[in-house]
């Protein structure tokens, strides 16, 4: 059994947390997100947070008082971005890599965001989740950015952390969705991001136990196929699936989409976040 380690970060302990030893991994950079509202320390190489995490956060339908679980949180970018947008959530960051989990803990403290950090393999069994305080029917919202690159078309990185964070196996998505279904309460909300050409995999994984799907395709520009899909699903939902108008990261002229830039700067949310 994989042992889970859980620790809670309280905003009042930010100075003490910041003084703790950082992971002895590669060089660390400090980067601004949400227009500088969120400062995150992360490895200079390997798996780094970017637009995917912030778009996922902007699509997460959380409300104040919700228990929100970020599966595979990395350094905490998506979950902490949700907490910055929606005050008063009970945030849990779940990450398998101890170094990234330590960065997530310090990032939460440095940004004065209260969060529980759990070191746990998302594909661990139910008993490991119970031990970590993530029992069945205990979460209101789950968000996740699982590894989604197709191994048959993507050369795996020699960096083990990067490979684990980016390359999916044949069972990755189904396993992560199964965990979300188990820990969510009835009518709980799931938000996820996946590569657009894998939409059939997403629909298949959500077919058992989820409904009321809302799908938002993300395009680099209007002339190219979608590169990502953002999906919101409801545990036990029965409403018909809705396909939203495409989100264009850049206009046809190549200029960044102004509304998307506002969302990335923390000045707005995506339609999937409204409930």
Regions found by a protein language model. Give the residues of each.
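Conserved class I S-adenosyl-L-methionine
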Residues: 65-74
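Class I SAM-dependent transferase core
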Residues: 25-63
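SAM/dcSAM-binding transferase cores
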Residues: 225-275
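Mobile active-site "lid"/loop adjacent to the S-adenosyl-L-methionine
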Residues: 146-175
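A short acidic, Gly/Pro-enriched loop at the edge of an enzyme's catalytic core
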Residues: 128-141
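Conserved Class I SAM-dependent methyltransferase catalytic core
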Residues: 45, 49, 170-226
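Conserved SAM-binding loop of SAM-dependent methyltransferases across substrates and taxa
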Residues: 75-88
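Conserved SAM-binding loop
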Residues: 104-105
């Amino acid at each position: 059994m994989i042992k889970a380690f859980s620790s809670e970060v309280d905003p009042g302990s930010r100075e003490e947390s910041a003084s703790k030893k950082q992971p002895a991994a590669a060089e660390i950079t400090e980067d601004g997100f949400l227009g500088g509202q969120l400062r995150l320390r992360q490895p200079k190489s390997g798996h780094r947070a970017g637009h995917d995490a912030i778009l996922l956060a902007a699509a997460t339908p959380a409300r104040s008082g919700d228990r929100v679980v970020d599966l595979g949180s990395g350094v905490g970018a998506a979950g902490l971005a949700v907490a910055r947008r929606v005050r008063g959530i009970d945030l849990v960051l779940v990450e398998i890599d101890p170094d990234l989990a330590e960065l997530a803990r310090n990032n939460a403290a440095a940004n004065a965001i209260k969060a529980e950090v759990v070191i746990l393999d998302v594909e661990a069994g139910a008993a490991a989740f119970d031990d970590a305080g993530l029992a069945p029917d205990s979460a209101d919202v789950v968000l996740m950015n699982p590894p989604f690159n197709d191994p048959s078309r993507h050369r795996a990185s020699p960096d083990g952390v990067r490979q684990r964070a980016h390359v999916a196996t044949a069972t990755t998505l189904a396993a992560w969705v199964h965990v979300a279904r188990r820990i969510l309460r009835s009518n709980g909300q799931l938000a996820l991001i996946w590569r657009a050409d894998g939409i059939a995999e997403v629909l298949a994984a959500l077919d058992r136990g989820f409904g009321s799907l809302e799908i938002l395709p993300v395009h680099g520009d209007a002339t190219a196929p979608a590169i990502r899909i953002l999906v919101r699903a409801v545990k036990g939902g029965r409403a018909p699936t809705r396909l939203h108008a495409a989100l264009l990261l850049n206009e046809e002229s190549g200029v960044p989409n102004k509304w998307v830039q506002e969302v990335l700067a923390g000045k707005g949310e995506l339609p999937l976040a409204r409930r």
